[in-house]
């Protein structure tokens, strides 16, 4: 897991708040380095499914808001955006929230 110092119940509470605010479903945690646009060593990376109505602005907002709640940078990868080898491998690496 890439977030050893975050209490799981607090993490689940913050994820639920983001899922209530944005049309997104967080599937789980990804290993550090899975998200290409996140460079902070303390970042947390998630795999998510988009729900109807999710825009790019919503996705960015979910990353920022969840990052604010967790106190560190967050990266979110959408299952629908995975192609080829990544589409097969990343879902296998997900750790439940």
Task: Specify the residue positions occupied by each region the protein language model found.
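Catalytic core of pol beta-like nucleotidyltransferases
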Residues: 1-39, 50-97
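Short, hydrophobic beta-strand segments
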Residues: 45-48
